[in-house]
Design a protein with these regions (language model features):
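Conserved beta-sheet core of the metallophosphoesterase superfamily
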Residues: 135, 187-260
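Active-site-proximal segments of metal-dependent phosphoesterases and phosphodiesterases across multiple
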Residues: 145-209, 218
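A short C-terminal boundary segment appended to hydrolase-like catalytic domains
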Residues: 250-299
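Binuclear metal-dependent hydrolase catalytic cores centered on His/Asp/Glu-rich metal-binding motifs
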Residues: 80-176
Length: 299
C-alpha cells in the first residue's frame, strides 16, 4: 500500500529496537542494505533514520564471557531504588572507560547506528531536532533500555526480567519543543515502583514509541499518546504472527492562538497472501486521529 504517494513530505524512519537477532555484525550489514533500499525509495538521506537498541541487539557472547561487563550490569540490576540506579548509571557514564565496558554488548549496534547519529557509546540517550514549523521543533529522543540485558533476561520460569531506565534518560521540558521518544522496552517492562518513571514520561513526552511486544497497542495519555508499535518481521512461530508497521504524521494547528498537536497514526499490516502491507482493517477508518493540547505543546 503506497501511502507515500498521498503525503507531501516524508521526514524519517523510526525503529524501536531489535534491528538484529543476536547483535551480530552480519545482521547489521543486512539491515543497512534494507534501510538503504527504503531510503532510496523514499528519497530520504540516511541521517533521517532514527533507532535505538533492543534486547536482540545485545551480543550475549560478550555478556556471558566478559567479567567486567557482567559486574557493571550486576551493579545496575541490583540497584535497590530508582535513585540508586540513577547514581550508579551516572557514575558509569562519567568514566569513559566504564561506559565503554557497559556498552560493549551493543558494539555492533553502535557501529551500525553511528551512520545515523544514533549510537550509545558514551551516553544513555541521543536527541535530534526537526522543525515542524517556524515556531515549533520536534525533538526525537532516543532512550537505551537494554543496559542490563543479557543471557539471563528470562528467568527459570520463563518470565521476563524487568529492564531499567534512569530519570536522567527522560528529557527536561523545553519551550516550543514537542518530544517524540524511541525506547525498545515499554513501561510495563521496567523496574518502576509507583510508576514514577512512566508518569514522568507521560508528563513530558507527547509521542512515546515502544517495541519489544509484537502486538500493536495505541493509547492516549493526559498529554500525549503511547504507541506499542508491533513488529515488522516477527517470528513465524508466534501464535499471533502479524507483521506490521505504522505511518505517523505530525502537524500543529492554532485555534484562537492556542496550539494543538495533530497526530495521525496509519497502522499497516501484511495482507492475507503476504504480498503487501495494507491498512489495518481492525480500526475504524484508515487512521487514528489524536488532537493534543496542554503542557507538552505550548509556547
Amino acid at each position: 500500500y503506497e501511502y507515500r504517494k498521498k503525503i507531501s513530505t516524508i521526514d524519517g524512519i523510526l525503529i524501536c529496537g531489535d534491528i538484529a537477532f543476536s547483535g551480530d555484525e552480519q545482521q547489521y550489514n543486512s539491515a543497512t542494505t534494507f534501510l538503504n533500499e527504503i531510503c532510496n525509495a523514499l528519497n530520504l538521506d540516511k541521517s533521517h533514520v532514527f533507532c535505538v537498541p533492543g534486547n536482540h541487539d545485545i551480543d550475549q557472547k560478550i555478556t556471558s564471557s566478559q567479567m567486567a561487563v557482567a559486574l557493571l550490569q550486576k551493579k545496575l540490576d541490583e540497584s535497590k531504588s530508582t535513585t540508586e540506579f540513577d547514581l550508579n548509571l551516572g557514575k558509569i557514564f562519567r568514566k569513559p572507560e566504564d561506559a565503554t565496558v557497559l556498552c560493549a554488548p551493543i558494539s555492533c549496534y553502535n557501529n551500525f547506528a553511528a551512520k545515523y547519529g544514533c549510537s550509545f557509546d558514551q551516553k544513555p540517550t541521543w536527541k535530534q531536532e526537526i522543525a515542524i514549523n517556524d515556531t515549533f521543533t520536534l525533538c526525537i529522543f532516543g532512550i537505551n533500555s537494554a543496559f542490563i540485558s543479557n543471557e539471563h533476561d528470562h528467568k527459570p520460569d520463563q518470565t521476563e526480567r524487568k529492564m531499567r531506565i534512569s530519570r536522567m534518560q527522560i528529557p527536561e521540558r523545553k519551550e516550543n519543543t514537542v518530544y517524540l521518544s524511541l525506547c525498545h522496552h515499554p513501561p510495563e517492562c521496567w523496574v518502576d515502583p509507583g510508576k514514577i518513571l512512566s508518569k514522568k514520561m507521560d508528563d513530558r513526552i507527547a509521542i512515546q514509541l515502544y517495541g519489544h511486544k509484537h502486538l500493536q497497542m495505541i493509547r492516549k495519555t493526559s498529554y500525549g499518546i503511547v504507541v506499542g508499535s508491533g513488529a515488522t518481521h516477527p517470528s513465524r512461530l508466534e501464535s499471533d504472527w502479524m507483521p506490521r508497521y505504522n505511518w505517523i504524521t505530525i502537524d500543529i494547528e492554532f485555534e484562537k492562538e492556542v496550539p494543538t498537536l495533530i497526530i495521525k497514526v496509519y497502522p499497516r499490516v501484511l495482507d492475507d497472501i503476504e504480498s503487501k502491507f495494507i491498512p489495518d482493517g481492525s480500526i475504524n477508518g484508515e487512521y487514528l486521529n489524536f488532537s493534543l493540547k496542554g503542557r507538552n505543546i505550548r509556547r
